[in-house]
A protein has these predicted regions:
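N-terminal subdomain of nucleotide-sugar transferases
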Residues: 1-54, 236
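Conserved acidic donor-binding segment of nucleotide-sugar-dependent glycosyltransferases
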Residues: 312-322, 331-332
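A charged, aromatic-enriched C-terminal amphipathic alpha-helix characteristic of glycosyltransferases
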Residues: 332-370, 395-400
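A short, active-site helix/loop in glycosyltransferases that binds the activated sugar's phosphate group
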Residues: 148, 155-189
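Nucleotide-sugar-dependent
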Residues: 276-286, 302, 307-308
Length: 463
């Protein structure tokens, strides 16, 4: 179990309603953030979220930090308000051991913002690729390529997480023509871990009047990348069936509904089945797992990433229009359909924990200067980072050695209260005697506390 770490999550929000409210419950990128939090319950998580949200704030080990993300999908990959971002954090009281960056293009900006505060020298970096930039993933040829920024981030990170072991191959498709650099796929693969994810359980159900029979659900975004063009081509001739698109931006003839989670489950359970037409670029898919979770058949266009989700032996793949029509017409006789898929979350959790453990277990060359002075303060009841630094290193902003001291403290077993947004150290009883021996020669005169120890009555009073 990973204990005592503080992790900054820079998210990749893609789902907003018409009022600008972040729809976290429908945002597949944000679901990955929540999964990593659940995998690391003994860590404190600082989550940078859109200003307008209604994410439940009920966990002591999670602090939400509001930031003005752009609502535009493309702009979010390039827009960064460095002044606002760095002013969100007060490193007199806070520490980040890891940054989990869900927009790789932004990692350099994050590091520069922290460097302006002389912070981040030994902060480890994980990248999460929810999309890979290539011509197949861009909505238009007019969109400037971003793959060089993604490659830059890979150079700056410790580990890069792709949904599957084949997803990084999309980066290589940018190098068909000669350019200023080459594509070193082996370098990327050496840093790669995978984060396959399971769909969230659809718990509540809310009946409503569907008003149609023989419903086929298209539960993907209404976009070229999800195969809508092929879908519209293949459904030609299926006049006895009603296609129901769950994206409210879909044309009216496909209903384009805006259902809540309970209604969405009811629709799936009372349909003939759902379908996936992802036919080119893809790295993962949650929507096909939703239908399978309620024991309904899901017709899946045969694509390599989809095989990673449901397995190579899945019986409802199709390629041609004729194959699709045959499977659709068989749905009426199929009824309930059971197909077990791997526990993807279990694999994801293992890869996250293993990657963190590998970094934290690297041997240390020497004990940082002043580390024993910090231990001496903690042993004498001075627990907050700001208060310790005032005793040992008054010029905190001019000295970055305390970042390395923190890593050392965690390595030898000092506790950090991860239910507090502020760094708060204590010495466990099982190592107290050892710590007393380590500091027996410390010559540090503890000054009276001139600043009241940091306390808080709510989690967010520091920004």
């Amino acid at each position: 179990m990973i204990n005592g770490l503080r992790i900054l999550h820079y998210v990749s929000p893609v789902r907003f309603d018409k009022t600008g409210l972040f729809q976290h419950e429908f945002d597949s990128n944000y679901k990955v953030v929540e999964k990593t939090i659940s995998f690391l319950p003994r860590c404190h998580h600082y989550v940078v979220v859109p200003k307008k949200h209604n994410i439940p704030d009920t966990r002591d080990n999670v602090t939400f930090i509001n930031y003005p993300y752009s609502r535009d999908l493309l702009a979010n990959r390039s827009y960064f308000d460095g002044v606002t971002f760095r002013n969100l954090f007060d490193f007199r009281y806070m520490d980040f051991d890891f940054v989990f960056c869900h927009q790789p293009e932004m990692l350099y900006n994050i590091l520069v913002s922290f460097n302006d505060k002389r912070y981040g020298q030994n902060m480890n970096r994980f990248l999460f690729f929810h999309w890979v930039d290539c011509s197949q993933s861009r909505a238009s040829s007019a969109i400037p390529p971003a793959y060089m920024r993604q490659l830059e981030a890979i150079n700056l990170c410790d580990n890069v997480f792709f949904h599957t072991d084949i997803a990084s191959e999309w980066l290589g498709k940018n190098f068909k023509n000669e350019q200023s650099t080459t594509f070193n796929h082996d370098y990327i693969k050496d840093k790669t871990q995978t984060f396959p994810i399971s769909a969230d359980e659809l718990q509540d159900i809310e009946p409503f009047d569907i008003e149609h029979e023989n419903v086929l659900v298209f539960n993907h975004r209404w976009a070229k990348s999800t195969g809508v063009n092929r879908m519209m081509e293949y459904i030609d001739g299926l006049d006895d069936f009603k296609i129901w698109a769950t994206d409210y931006q879909a044309p009216k003839e496909y209903i384009g509904s805006n259902l809540n989670r309970g209604q969405y489950r009811y629709l799936l359970e009372n349909s003939l089945g759902s379908m996936s037409f992802v036919d080119s670029y893809a790295t993962w898919n949650l929507s096909i797992q939703d239908g399978l979770s309620v024991k309904k058949p899901v017709l899946v266009y045969d694509q390599p990433a989809m095989r990673k989700v449901v397995g190579d032996d899945y019986p409802l793949f199709f390629k041609t229009k004729d194959e699709f029509h045959t499977q659709v017409k068989n749905l009426k006789q199929m009824g309930n359909f059971t197909w077990d898929i791997p526990n993807h979350d279990e694999k994801f959790a293992y890869n996250i924990i293993k990657s963190i453990s590998n970094i934290m277990s690297k041997p240390r060359k020497h004990i940082p200067k002043d580390a024993n002075n910090w231990l001496y303060c903690i042993l004498n009841g001075i627990k907050y980072k700001h208060d310790i630094a005032k005793q040992v290193q008054p010029n905190l902003q001019l000295n970055s050695v305390w970042q390395y001291i923190r890593r050392y403290l965690l390595e030898i077993g000092i506790n950090d209260n991860t239910n507090s947004p502020f760094v708060s150290y204590s010495i466990p009883n099982n190592i107290r005697e050892d710590v007393e021996k380590m500091v027996k020669d410390v010559d540090l005169e503890l000054r009276p506390m001139t600043i009241k120890q940091k306390t808080f009555t709510k989690k967010h009073d520091w920004f």
